[in-house]
């Protein structure tokens, strides 16, 4: 089980701003080794209660809230990560549990016992939450990510574009999964994650986009139709 606690800033920027920042970062810090030429896809299945508790708490701006998701980086992946993200004031805590493809498929089909049988306290905690609040699969979200990393303060900077989703087919291993765009193709979500404090050159880089800082959730964006959410 992986446990990460860090601060996180999000900005909604356009493609021109993203290109300028990416060019700057390419000459300043390391690119993520998983990037390849054009970045990499991220696909997540989000779970929520029957009453959409997590969605509603995000919409209402509740300070302490959570999201539960199952994540893969390819429909051909042999494993998936079951994750809980918790908002704790200015911090985001993310805990992850690795599941086999078979376990992940069972989870998608509603068999949450794979969490209980994981031998992990975190898995047992998630099982209890999902059973107590009657969590069900709600939406699949996919986007294209290009990432940069710096060892100082565990800085990670990501550019997410082409955000798309569906609320019908929850099989994240489906190669032919039909997804619909939920964000303008001209927009990019910039995320800056770090421990402690941001280094001065990163702060300087962000000055032109400071006014674009937002509290955005890809999960909520994906559910804008089903929950009458407007971004």
Stretch-by-stretch model annotation:
Residues 1-231:
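Phosphate-end processing signature that detects enzymes handling 5′-triphosphorylated RNA
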